[in-house]
Amino acid sequence: MNKRTLEEQAIHRKTKTSKDYLWPHLRDLPYFRAILRAVEARFYQDVELPAPVLDVGCGDGHFATIAFDKKLDVGLDPWSGPIHEAAGRGAYRLLTQADGGRMPFPDQFFASAISNSVLEHIPHVEAVLLETARVLKPGAPFTFCVPNHNFLPTLSIGRSLDRLGLRSLANRYRAFFNRISRHHHCDPPEVWQPRLEKAGFQIERWWHYFPPHALHVLEWGHYFGLPSLLSKRLTGYWILAPTQWNLALTRQIVLDLYEEDPVCENGVYSFYITRRCE
């Protein structure tokens, strides 16, 4: 067992906590999104985030209300709908609607920043990284997570088509799933490292998480979860009856995924802890 594997196991042991991050996500989100966000929320419990904290791509603020016990200082997002939802949740002291490539903040204003499953959706990610570096103090931590190079090859339907010799169809399926996931970047650390260094960040540590069988649950959840999408569009809520009894079976199905060690070499997402260069 190599040093990196031992370090990954230590990370997971440290991030085990008695707080339940699964249920607060499960009662508000489709189950396939809930399990991923619950795993990610657990990682942040060992990440030091000195104030003021910037959340790059805060969305509707749902994740921040669950992952952090205190309000984050500033949430930034380019879309008005999610910003208004975030305001209603009270997850941030201040909310700003702006493009991440043109932030309305002075140089070296923030002491830390996060971006949870956001950077993969941004075509101009290099510009956003440069702006994030600009508004961070020298030495400030920047923590984020993104899907990686394992994501698309691991999709179950694509792999099944590969085994049948239908590689062209498999690649078309992967392109389709990437499109509905709104991904512009599913890159390995070898791509992220020079990208971050060019923007002025140094990677302190990273790990892959969310194993293939967990991705398959997420993948099929996109199809089985279509009723939740209809509910969201008609009522504004993903889950119409967010009660323990209604979601008991769903919770039981995904509980093992939440409780198992999510850190693995073939994980399809990567968690990065970086620091603004001095």
Question: Predicted regions span which residues?
Answer:
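A short beta-strand submotif of the Rossmann-like class I SAM-dependent methyltransferase core
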Residues: 115-118
